[in-house]
């Protein structure tokens, strides 16, 4: 029974009865349960039409309504407050979660295919924490969209044709790869050294341009030769390191799409011709696409005069390929890509395709400062994770929850994944953020350990409980802590629906912290195993059991596992 929707439907009927008109109604939640579970201000909105004071309208409406699942309706200063019957509501909530288990929070399947592109870092060095924000938000959004019923395919767009990769190929012939290091880190060292070499010897720049031109020509002709093999090997080597980092954080892509695929297939040349035929292309030192009809003053550089393509052209082709294979596409991009994203989307519109949705994220830094790949000064995601794991292991040892080093390592790894992922995803993408260790590994207030610790508490309470009797559950006057946690638990499906709808995974992150904090208040104020009244004891055990399920299901949406012990 969806009490909230029942209230809204009943109020809409009442408004129609009073005015003959429709009204869009949204309910608020009072700050404390003793003030009601839901509240509406419709009396103020009706005052003009009914020519009555809001206070009087509220009292009339409150006295005239009867809603299933609501035990009291109260008019206070023009507002109408609704109080749920928590005995029935709690039984229904606990029963639903217990029956659905790991499926609680998942919505009905939709017949819609989504292509979600995230991470897509150039294969010229390890991921830095800016890439980390992209991958964590992207993977969390993927999980939330799947839970909300979409068929989701995640893609990583591999830039194997750009200047950066040509520099890596050029450098691999002059500097030895350190095979003792993780692949992407070794490639990164070559890239940094090669950039230094190019800065000191400007005449070498022509060799980079020749590599790019020769590689594209080989791809366009469908030729596989020594040069194409060098590019393929360099990219594959770096991707091996990338996949290792991603899997450490429980992130997996369904498909790696190489930029060169679209040159080899002839699709790039076909799209350039289609754009030329629009009459919107102008020629100066390059071919440029005029998008002024879409309010863009800057022209999109489409191709060189010799016909070779540019990254922007290949990106448009990649997006056409996506749009032809999905109902809608979502991209995760840094805020510095806003203009490029708009230009790509308007080019798609010009050719008659749907535009991609874009989730932009702002920069992330550490308190020590920001990162730069090109100059070789950056904090890699691998370093960030190892630091998180080291700090987590120290905390696990201090708390004495495990003595075996192997067990400490496993617990620390799960805490570290949670610390990194949760601390990133909890902040709205459009806000710049500083990654702070005291927040990421906070066991008391805002960190993922707070949530994982609440789960560990649930597990400890339940470890020796064989069965939970369903007899007379919640057949007593529940206190505010019990009501608060049950109401929170019931919200997961709507949280998933909302987060998917607005593409904001931080909604899920904020919700799961609320659940953990609500449970901790319940735990502090409501004895469970020591409760002597069997009805109350079993009801509280049911709350603990369903809290454990909701914490597991919700953190799974964020790609985070439970350590078990903490």
UniProtKB/Swiss-Prot annotation:
Coarsely, its chief localization is: cytoplasm
Q: Which GO terms describe its molecular function?
A: arginine-tRNA ligase activity; ATP binding
Coiled-coil segments on the chain, per record: none
Motif range ('HIGH' region): 121-131
Domain of life per record: Archaea
Q: Which NCBIfam families match?
A: argS
Q: HAMAP family recorded for this chain?
A: Arg_tRNA_synth
The family database entries (SMART domains) matched by this protein are listed as: Arg_tRNA_synt_N, DALR_1
The entry's keywords: Aminoacyl-tRNA synthetase, ATP-binding, Cytoplasm, Ligase, Nucleotide-binding, Protein biosynthesis
Q: Which GO terms describe its cellular component?
A: cytoplasm
> Which Gene Ontology BP terms does the record give?
arginyl-tRNA aminoacylation
Protein name in the entry: Arginine--tRNA ligase
Q: Which InterPro entries match?
A: aa-tRNA-synth_I_CS, Arg-tRNA-ligase, Arg-tRNA-synth_N, Arg-tRNA-synth_N_sf, ArgRS_core, DALR_anticod-bd, Rossmann-like_a/b/a_fold, tRNAsynth_Ia_anticodon-bd
Q: According to its UniProt record, where is this protein located?
A: Cytoplasm
EC assignment: 6.1.1.19
């Amino acid at each position: 029974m969806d009490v909230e929707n029942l209230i809204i439907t009943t109020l809409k009927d009442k408004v129609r009865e009073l005015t003959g008109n429709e009204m869009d109604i949204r309910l608020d939640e009072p700050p404390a349960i003793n003030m009601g579970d839901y509240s509406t201000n419709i009396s103020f909105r009706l005052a003009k039409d009914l020519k009555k004071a809001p206070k009087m309208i509220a009292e009339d409406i409150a006295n005239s309504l009867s809603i299933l699942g609501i035990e009291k309706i109260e008019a206070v200063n023009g507002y109408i407050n609704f109080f749920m019957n928590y005995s029935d509501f709690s039984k229904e909530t606990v029963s639903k979660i217990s029956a659905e288990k790991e499926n609680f929070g998942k919505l009905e399947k939709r017949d819609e295919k989504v292509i979600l592109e995230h991470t897509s870092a150039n294969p010229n060095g390890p991921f830095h924490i800016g890439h980390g924000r992209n991958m964590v938000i992207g993977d969390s959004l993927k999980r939330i969209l799947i839970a909300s019923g979409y068929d989701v395919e995640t893609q990583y767009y591999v830039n194997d044709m750009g200047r950066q990769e040509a520099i890596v190929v050029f450098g691999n012939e002059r500097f030895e790869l350190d095979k003792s290091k993780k692949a992407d880190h070794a490639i990164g060292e070559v890239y940094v050294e090669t950039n230094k070499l190019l800065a000191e010897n400007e005449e070498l720049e022509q060799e980079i341009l020749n590599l790019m031109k020769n590689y594209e020509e080989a791809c366009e002709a469908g030729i596989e030769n020594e040069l194409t093999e060098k590019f393929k090997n360099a990219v594959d080597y770096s991707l091996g390191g990338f996949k290792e980092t991603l899997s450490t954080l429980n992130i997996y892509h369904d498909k790696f799409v190489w930029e060169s695929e679209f040159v080899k297939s002839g699709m790039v040349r076909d799209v350039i011709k289609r754009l030329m035929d629009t009459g919107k292309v102008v020629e100066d030192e390059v071919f440029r696409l005029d998008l002024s009809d879409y309010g863009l003053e800057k022209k999109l550089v489409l191709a060189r005069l010799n016909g070779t393509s540019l990254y922007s052209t290949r990106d448009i082709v990649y997006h056409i390929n996506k749009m032809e294979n999905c109902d809608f596409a979502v991209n995760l991009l840094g805020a510095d890509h806003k203009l490029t994203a708009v230009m790509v989307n308007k080019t798609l519109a010009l050719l008659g395709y749907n535009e991609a949705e874009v989730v932009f994220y702002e920069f992330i830094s550490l308190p020590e400062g920001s990162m730069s790949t090109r100059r070789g000064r950056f904090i890699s995601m691998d370093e960030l994770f190892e630091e998180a794991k080291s700090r987590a292991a120290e905390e696990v040892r201090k708390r004495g929850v495990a003595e075996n080093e192997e067990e400490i390592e496993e617990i620390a790894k799960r805490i570290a994944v949670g610390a990194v992922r949760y601390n990133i995803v909890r902040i709205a993408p459009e806000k710049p953020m500083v990654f702070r260790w005291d927040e990421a590994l906070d066991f008391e207030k805002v960190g993922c350990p707070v949530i994982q610790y609440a789960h560990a508490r649930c597990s400890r309470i339940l470890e020796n409980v064989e069965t939970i009797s369903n007899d007379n559950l919640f057949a007593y006057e529940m206190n505010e802590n019990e009501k608060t946690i049950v109401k929170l638990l019931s919200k997961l499906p709507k949280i998933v629906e909302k987060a998917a709808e607005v593409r904001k995974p931080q909604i899920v992150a904020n919700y799961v912290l609320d659940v953990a904090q609500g449970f901790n208040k319940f735990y502090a104020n409501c004895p469970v195993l020591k409760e002597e009244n069997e009805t109350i004891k079993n009801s509280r055990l049911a709350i603990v059991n369903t809290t454990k399920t909701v914490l597991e299901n919700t953190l799974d949406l964020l790609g985070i596992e439970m350590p078990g012990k903490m």
